[in-house]
Amino acid sequence: MKRQLPSIRLAIKTSLNGVCLALVSLCALSCWLEDRITNGSESMFLFWAHVFSVFPGQLGVFLRRAYYRLTLDRCASNFYIGFGALFTHRCALVEKDTYIGPYALVGSAHLGEGCLIGSRASLLSGTEQHALDEQGRWGPCDKARLRQIKIGDYAWIGEGAIVMANIGAGTMVAAGAVVEQDARAGILVAGNPSRFVRKLREEPQTQS
């Protein structure tokens, strides 16, 4: 009986994923129609993103996952997205085994395999979404100025961190850090602005 439990759980999970895909399909269709009719507007996409972000419990996880599988440019079928978390742009990419904590905010980003996004972290679409006009006033977000950032495989973004640049594979961003410059793979960065702290894994020594 114990040997059958994993297969039973998998069957239940697969069935729930299918049911949730069906439940959100009309919502996803409205986003698709909006994109075609309005030449790229994301108002409907954001409306449903906010609606599904506040569904509690495991049902909410399944609904959010189903919604983004149908609306993002690419989205794996096995990832976790917590309560209050949402994507702000359809152009995001999500690889398998990614974890997105509660209240995280993800813009135009490519989330690598197995990366961890901590609670209340913000992944912004670069550093130049807004521009000053001739009168010195800041304008609204300009989609033409968005830059897709890359979070490398198995990187860890700490709670409350703000990331506006690429993060290398296996790198850890400390809680509350503000990252404006690219961080290479396998290191720890912390602070505002973020600074290199140390390597997370020493390179093997070669004997001569």
Identify the residue ranges that each predicted region occupies.
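Conserved active-site beta-strand element of glycosyltransferases/polysaccharide synthases
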Residues: 189
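Beta-rich strand-turn-strand
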Residues: 159-172, 177-181
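Terminal amphipathic alpha-helical/low-complexity segments used for targeting or macromolecular assembly
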Residues: 1-73, 136, 154, 192-208
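A short, terminal or domain-edge coil/loop segment
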Residues: 2-4, 35-37, 85, 132-144, ...
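Conserved beta-to-alpha transition
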Residues: 184-185
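Flexible, glycine/small-residue-enriched loop-and-beta-strand segment within the central core
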Residues: 54-66, 73-74, 83-95, 99-167, ...
